[in-house]
């Protein structure tokens, strides 16, 4: 409207916008310990969320006299199963081992329904189905991720700790020809301040190092060939959309880190230092397909390799401690040097709000 006159503004007041949000979460944990050093824990959880957005221009609306209604319904269901078992055993008086195992399964389902209707027969309570012109859209997505792990922690004199483990994951988004992904890990820590040569008044110090792998799965339909249903003039048809990749798997990040945790002056001074070096292989990147295949969209492929390294430093000081008040000061500093090592033969492309090119940093 060209002016702020009350009569003009009042013509849009019947515009009715509503949003309704619902959330329901529940879960339970069962623990079984047949022995003091043998425990089992099973946790089940369920999370349901729903959002409905309703946009109504009623019958008699100034800009659309016969009215229009848009209704969008979004639902998400998340179901989780988590089991962990552990067994602790004293090998020697000063040597203890803790062996644990378990598995996890997560099901994530998303549904979205959208209806549009226009031109109602009268001023009755409007619904999408009561309109003379109706359009509907529906999207569904379900992803299951499941895995199991084994881990052992070796404790020697409460000073030396060696942790080794492995996790095996499967995901419904992986290609049919990929299979399972294995992620190993190992870490070592040394409580240096517990040694006899460490001065009693020189605080606490722990040295640590670790190596491990983690992964990021592709999207729900990235590995399968898909077709986009379209229609023109009432004639149904399909057009090519995603070419698919039966060997598509997760991108895998391997990381090595080393550092220390220190505490002095009765825990009033705390410092943390970490150096890390990451290398991501089989990075998920969009690769342009040959137009002769009939698929004009890009296809997600495991082709890239990216490296990251840097340091993380943290310092926390308890400047004032009293019964009535306290004053703490903290500062953190970090660096990250990244490089696109390889694009797997793909040409440079725009992504992540920047330009991806071999030999250059990641935006």
Task: Give each language-model segment a name.
Residues 62-65:
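Flexible, solvent-exposed loop segments that connect beta-strands
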């Amino acid at each position: 409207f060209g002016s702020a006159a009350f009569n003009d503004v009042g013509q849009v007041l019947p515009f009715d916008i509503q949003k309704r949000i619902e959330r329901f979460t529940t879960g339970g944990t069962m623990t079984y310990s047949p022995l003091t050093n043998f425990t089992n824990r099973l946790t089940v959880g369920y999370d349901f969320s729903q959002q409905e957005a309703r946009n109504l221009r009623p019958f008699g609306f100034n800009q659309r006299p016969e009215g229009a209604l848009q209704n969008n319904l979004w639902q998400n269901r998340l179901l989780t199963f988590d089991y962990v078992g552990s067994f602790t055993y004293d090998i020697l008086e000063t040597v203890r081992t803790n062996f644990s195992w378990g598995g996890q399964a997560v099901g994530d389902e998303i549904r979205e329904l959208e209806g549009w209707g226009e031109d109602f027969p009268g001023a009755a309570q409007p619904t999408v189905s009561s309109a003379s012109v109706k359009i509907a859209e529906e999207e569904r997505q379900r992803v299951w991720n499941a895995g199991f792990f084994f881990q052992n922690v070796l404790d020697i004199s409460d000073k030396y700790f060696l942790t080794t483990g492995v996790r095996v994951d499967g995901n419904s988004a992986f290609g049919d020809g990929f299979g399972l992904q294995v992620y190993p890990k190992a870490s070592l820590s040394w409580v240096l301040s517990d040694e006899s040569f460490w001065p009693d008044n020189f605080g606490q110090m722990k040295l640590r190092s670790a190596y491990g792998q983690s992964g990021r799965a592709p999207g729900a339909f990235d590995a399968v060939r898909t077709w986009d249903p379209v229609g023109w003039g009432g004639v149904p048809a399909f057009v090519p959309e995603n070419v698919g990749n039966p060997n598509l798997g997760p991108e895998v990040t391997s990381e090595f880190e080393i550092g220390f945790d220190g505490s002095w002056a009765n825990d009033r001074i705390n410092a943390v230092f970490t150096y890390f070096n990451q290398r991501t292989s089989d990075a998920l990147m969009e690769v342009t397909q040959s137009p002769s295949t009939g698929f004009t969209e890009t296809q997600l492929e495991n082709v890239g390799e990216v490296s990251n390294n840097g340091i993380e430093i943290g310092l926390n000081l308890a400047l004032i401690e009293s019964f009535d008040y306290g004053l703490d000061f903290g500062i953190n500093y970090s660096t990250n040097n990244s490089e696109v090592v390889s694009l797997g033969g793909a040409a440079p492309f725009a992504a992540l709000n920047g330009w991806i090119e071999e030999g250059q940093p990641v935006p």
